[in-house]
Amino acid sequence: MLPFAPQDEPWDREMEVFSGGGASSGEVNGLKMVDEPMEEGEADSCHDEGVVKEIPITHHVKEGYEKADPAQFELLKVLGQGSFGKVFLVRKKTGPDAGQLYAMKVLKKASLKVRDRVRTKMERDILVEVNHPFIVKLHYAFQTEGKLYLILDFLRGGDVFTRLSKEVLFTEEDVKFYLAELALALDHLHQLGIVYRDLKPENILLDEIGHIKLTDFGLSKESVDQEKKAYSFCGTVEYMAPEVVNRRGHSQSADWWSYGVLMFEMLTGTLPFQGKDRNETMNMILKAKLGMPQFLSAEAQSLLRMLFKRNPANRLGSEGVEEIKRHLFFANIDWDKLYKREVQPPFKPASGKPDDTFCFDPEFTAKTPKDSPGLPASANAHQLFKGFSFVATSIAEEYKITPITSANVLPIVQINGNAAQFGEVYELKEDIGVGSYSVCKRCIHATTNMEFAVKIIDKSKRDPSEEIEILMRYGQHPNIITLKDVFDDGRYVYLVTDLMKGGELLDRILKQKCFSEREASDILYVISKTVDYLHCQGVVHRDLKPSNILYMDESASADSIRICDFGFAKQLRGENGLLLTPCYTANFVAPEVLMQQGYDAACDIWSLGVLFYTMLAGYTPFANGPNDTPEEILLRIGNGKFSLSGGNWDNISDGAKDLLSHMLHMDPHQRYTAEQILKHSWITHRDQLPNDQPKRNDVSHVVKGAMVATYSALTHKTFQPVLEPVAASSLAQRRSMKKRTSTGL
């Protein structure tokens, strides 16, 4: 089934729900909708919030472990802010986990109502008990006279709400992954006797790989067993189950209704029950029929119907998570692999080095982190939070981290603000390379004296946002250059990366008098594996010339190879500018878009073929030297003729020649993909390749000049796309719209 067409701002749209007796159908915003006849639960009028009696606090601090205090944490950035507290990115300064990054939730006691104080204590108690791969972990909890502190996992991926509303188109298969992980997380809480009660996208975070982490337990309630019910009125109204709205008492089954709301929203971009105000929304939850989008698969519609049962006893999940797991919608989920985090997530967040906050709202991250002392609370406040402090039992064993020193502390990436200028942090040195839109220089970090490279891009000539995002998202791959810092002074953008001290790959190869097939195969394997990774993620490099493949260090080992300079790289996007997941690409993208993407990917492979040829032959396939004219080179490329005989070729294996001929095939559709390269016997059996090294003449300067001439000719021939300013994209325009307020802090 074709997924829901994305709107400009799907989270803010309201879905009309048809009223009246019997089933009916119609269209909402051009989409076919069918009213679902829904069973009637016990309707009751909606009440205002009153005084709620919460359960007593019974947990106490674990003894025998070092207690934490605010002085042990270095404030780095503000991640979020609410009416009674902030969430900071912090770095631990002492102890066995020195250098580790955490999220620190700081709550002012004086600002908390009694209800909120008990919820905060409850959140701490619940987190102490919980240990699950898809639930955020509490590492420390402590208090001062005026504040409460929760030290939690720092999840670099941000929240699912941000990802969904701003960047990505998901398919049913993608949504299924998140829902399956979420089902396991909810089940774990339910087995502990905990009702979550506040399930919404803002409370589902992503780690740097893309797995979920459920967070924010301030509204959760522990119950003794399944028969016990809670009666408090809490949660985000659009996600409330009918029994929560009418206050007839609710149990863990209420979470599965909210789970259905989340599923509906992730699949359609709209909420199933949303009125013009709070009261109308609650009345719709109690009485309205569900408008079921007909573009959803039969399995998805079936699961939604079974989750949206107003009688909690009839709701799927009321008898436990196995009911959910057995539903046909999840038929292809391997639950054991999923729990072990062995299933690849559909989307990798754009998070570079460990302390990046790229996925968090710049409204907060641009602020200077400051934890004010906080007014003392009332005299009995400390008594209320007695036993609040906690230290995770495994803290010493879990972190085998080198204590932090000035040598390994680097500044925080300046993506979302100009807290520091480039010149204040780094000292510029000599040029490394000069291009049409940028210059690359060596630089030295002022504090640590460490060497880096900086690419300085003129914003008036090129929009660097796509390059930055790609490096943020994929720069943690071992063979892709790592982005360390980003600065923007208005005219120029400074991209600080590792300094490639080993130099260009081709230079190192040409300087060797001898070079074996086994060495060439090792190098081609590493590069092809990296390119395959990028292509599988919908990223094409489009400028994979030898000067952009370098060695990280002087060892010149294959593992130290890095693909650099993503200035021409592109991520696959829909017409509205949203990123497309690999699943979306495979199923729903227009053929002409895929053809362009396939053409770009084939160009990457052709470039690898030119490099491969030169590694084996000691000269380039289409240019004889630096003085060849562009017309001569392009004519040879156009004819697709290159020699595989004479000279060194007489000593090269047939397997190498076969692979090379497929990589340099004239027809992009018949040219090998990176995946096919990796499956070729010359790569898979590279340990059996000859290790003898045919001697070559030292003509490295001629070969290098010929290579430069080849790519210069291609540049003359090929029209390079002019990128519009990022502000002109639909994605940027959507981001500038008024954001929906989060209550998740």
Curated annotation (Swiss-Prot):
Modifications after synthesis and translation: Phosphorylated at Ser-232, Ser-372, and Ser-389 in serum-starved cells.
GO term, biological process aspect, one: DNA damage response, signal transduction by p53 class mediator
Binding-site positions, ATP: 79-87, 105, 432-440, 455
GO cellular component labels: cytoplasm; cytosol; fibrillar center; mitochondrion; nucleolus; nucleoplasm
Subcellular location: Cytoplasm, Cytosol; Nucleus
Cofactor: Mg(2+)
Top EC group: transferase
Phosphothreonine, modified sites: T581
UniProt activity-regulation remark: Constitutively activated by phosphorylation at Ser-232, Ser-372, and Ser-389 in serum-starved cells. Does not require growth factor stimulation for significant kinase activity.
MF annotations from Gene Ontology: ATP binding; magnesium ion binding; protein kinase activity; protein serine kinase activity; ribosomal protein S6 kinase activity
Catalytic residues, chain numbering: D198 (proton acceptor), D543 (proton acceptor)
Enzyme Commission numbers on file: 2.7.11.1
Positions of region (Disordered): 1-28
Chain ranges of the Protein kinase domain: 73-330, 426-683
List of residues that carry Phosphoserine: S232, S372, S389
PANTHER family associated with the record: RIBOSOMAL PROTEIN S6 KINASE
Role summary: Constitutively active serine/threonine-protein kinase that exhibits growth-factor-independent kinase activity and that may participate in p53/TP53-dependent cell growth arrest signaling and play an inhibitory role during embryogenesis.
Family membership noted in the UniProt record: Belongs to the protein kinase superfamily. AGC Ser/Thr protein kinase family. S6 kinase subfamily.
Protein name (Swiss-Prot/TrEMBL): Ribosomal protein S6 kinase alpha-6
